[in-house]
């Protein structure tokens, strides 16, 4: 089980990996509590796939955090009930939703796409879209400069694929701790050579947005 986070400086990247075989609520709760015990605070947004164990745990451990469903995982879920010969057209329609410049516009676009899917005899795809679209739009409440960075968890997915490739090449491990040591070694390498040399997001945009919201509340 892994998580990746960014500090207020946005040049500090935190990657945490722990051995875990289950995706239930208790496993996620133990993982999140472990992160807090190691000093994690001020979590504002958690990005992930539609994992019920994680979703049930977030309000308990990180009550101030918002949840953003990864748009890529959301698309894949809709593709699971879409005929292969219609996937390209459906993909273009889905991307158009998240290309909108406001949450209201995205909601309206999603409504239009759902109607179009029904016309295409893709009622199951339309239902998945209608049922899940709202939790994919959380990123739109954050600075527009951050949108492309926080609507998916592609960064951690790529890293997880790399870790899987390396562990598969080795084969069997004597125990879970041995595998975890290999994973952590790879994470240290990536953090030191890639993440440590670039700024992932300019967090000044988020600070300004929060200041503006606070001013509106005081004035209102």
Label the model's feature ranges.
Residues 45-52, 57-93:
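Conserved beta-strand -> loop -> alpha-helix junction used to position metal-binding or nucleic-acid-contacting
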Residues 17-39:
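Active-site beta-loop-alpha junctions of metal-dependent nucleic acid enzymes
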Residues 22-29, 48, 52, 123, ...:
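Conserved structured core elements
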Residues 1-14:
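Single conserved hydrophobic/aromatic residue that forms the stacking wall/gate
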Residues 96-220:
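Acidic/histidine-rich catalytic cores and adjacent linkers
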Residues 20-24, 46, 67-70, 82-86, ...:
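A generic short alpha-helical patch detector that favors 3-5-residue windows
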Residues 12, 46-49, 70-73, 129, ...:
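Short, conserved catalytic/metal-binding motifs centered on acidic residues
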Residues 41-43:
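A general structural motif
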């Amino acid at each position: 089980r892994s998580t990746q986070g960014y500090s207020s400086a946005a040049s500090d990247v935190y990657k945490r990996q722990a051995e875990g075989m289950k995706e239930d609520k208790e496993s996620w709760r133990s993982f999140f509590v472990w992160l807090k015990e190691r000093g994690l605070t001020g979590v504002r947004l958690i990005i992930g796939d539609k994992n019920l164990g994680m979703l049930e745990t977030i309000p308990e451990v990180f009550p101030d955090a918002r949840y953003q469903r990864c748009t890529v995982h959301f698309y894949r879920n809709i593709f699971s009930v879409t005929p292969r010969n219609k996937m390209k057209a459906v993909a273009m329609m889905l991307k158009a939703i998240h290309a909108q410049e406001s949450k209201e516009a995205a909601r309206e676009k999603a409504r239009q796409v759902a109607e179009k899917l029904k016309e295409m005899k893709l009622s199951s795809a339309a239902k998945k879209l209608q049922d899940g679209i709202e939790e994919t739009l959380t990123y739109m409440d954050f600075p527009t400069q951050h949108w492309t960075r926080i609507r998916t968890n592609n960064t951690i997915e790529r890293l997880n694929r790399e870790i899987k490739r390396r562990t598969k090449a080795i084969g069997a491990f004597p125990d879970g701790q041995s595998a975890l040591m290999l994973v952590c070694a790879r994470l240290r390498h990536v953090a030191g050579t890639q993440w440590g040399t670039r700024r992932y997001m300019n967090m000044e945009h988020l600070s300004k947005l929060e200041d503006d919201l606070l001013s509106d509340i005081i004035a209102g």
